[in-house]
């Protein structure tokens, strides 16, 4: 079964554990997901079955939009509502001051991922090491903040909606935001509501060709695709270098054009 859809991962489960429940639900062992969510987070997770598991690298998965609640005055080792070491009653902030910092934190931001994150260190998730008291050597990264708005502020809780690039960590954004206020802060909730064009819709099966980040190309002799025969660049409508998809009624293929040579990246993928 080929299927791609947006699932809703609940809080408290790792992305792998959640995928296992979907494998059982749909009785399909060949499954995968893209865009790992930490156990603390909930929300949209892109899931694929069958041949569609090979398509993740072609999907347009940015920007990503989250809803987050910042708990001001709280110090947590994991930057969430676990591993809390200190809670301070701090003075309420002026909303205009908070908005000013939100506005300052637009564009490219440098950060170090939190120890309790899904980053892999030699094959092991950083949060698994952190649970054992092992500090991972996490390299500095960059994220881009496209937009951020305050939804509500009921001190000490600040609710925001933020749209970011792939690879961004909202907990790190929270940490940097708090630093500008001169306080500690942590997240009390985090939900991904959108990943690229993917939004949760009751696990409805999607037309993958509307979600891949590729241009269509065309060939007169579609039998070549059906048979996996060699394709020459002169037979195609578009000759510019790059990746394309070509579809027939039942199948599609993904090709690459480079130096006037056509190469199959994926061939004869059955439409769902």
From Swiss-Prot:
UniProt xrefs under SUPFAM superfamilies: Pseudouridine synthase (SSF55120)
SS bond partners: none
Highest rank taxon of the organism: Bacteria
Its EC number(s): 5.4.99.25
GO biological process, one term: tRNA pseudouridine synthesis
GO terms assigned for molecular function: RNA binding; tRNA pseudouridine(55) synthase activity
Catalytic reaction annotation: uridine(55) in tRNA = pseudouridine(55) in tRNA
The protein's enzyme class: isomerase
InterPro entries: PsdUridine_synth_cat_dom_sf (IPR020103), PsdUridine_synth_N (IPR002501), tRNA_psdUridine_synth_TruB (IPR014780)
Active site: residue positions: 38
UniProt keyword annotations, A-Z: Isomerase, tRNA processing
Record function comment: Responsible for synthesis of pseudouridine from uracil-55 in the psi GC loop of transfer RNAs.
Protein family according to the UniProt entry: Belongs to the pseudouridine synthase TruB family. Type 1 subfamily.
Protein name as it appears in the record: tRNA pseudouridine synthase B
Species classification: Bacteria, Pseudomonadati, Campylobacterota, Epsilonproteobacteria, Campylobacterales
């Amino acid at each position: 079964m080929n299927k791609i859809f947006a699932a809703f991962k609940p809080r408290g489960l790792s992305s792998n554990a959640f995928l296992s429940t979907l494998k059982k639900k749909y009785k399909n062992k060949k499954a995968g997901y893209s865009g790992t969510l930490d156990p603390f987070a909930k929300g949209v997770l892109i899931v694929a079955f069958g041949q569609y598991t090979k398509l993740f690298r072609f999907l347009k998965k940015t920007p990503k939009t989250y809803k987050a609640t910042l708990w001001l005055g709280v110090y947590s080792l994991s930057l969430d509502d676990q591993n809390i070491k200190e809670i301070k009653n701090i003075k309420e902030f002026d909303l205009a001051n908070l908005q000013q910092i939100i506005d300052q934190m637009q564009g490219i931001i440098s950060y170090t991922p939190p120890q309790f994150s899904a980053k892999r260190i030699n094959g092991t998730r950083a949060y698994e090491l952190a649970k054992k008291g092992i500090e991972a050597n996490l390299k500095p990264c960059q994220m881009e903040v496209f937009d951020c708005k305050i939804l509500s502020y009921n001190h000490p809780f600040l609710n925001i909606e933020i749209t970011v690039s792939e690879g961004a960590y909202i907990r790190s954004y929270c940490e940097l935001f708090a630093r500008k206020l001169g306080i500690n802060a942590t997240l009390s909730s985090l939900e991904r509501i959108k990943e690229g064009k993917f939004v949760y819709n009751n696990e409805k099966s999607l037309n993958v060709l509307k979600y891949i980040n590729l241009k269509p190309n065309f060939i007169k002799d579609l039998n070549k695709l059906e048979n996996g025969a060699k394709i020459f660049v002169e037979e195609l409508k578009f000759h510019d270098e790059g990746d394309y998809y070509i579809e027939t009624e039942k199948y599609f293929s993904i090709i690459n054009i480079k130096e006037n040579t056509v190469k199959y990246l994926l061939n004869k993928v059955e439409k769902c």
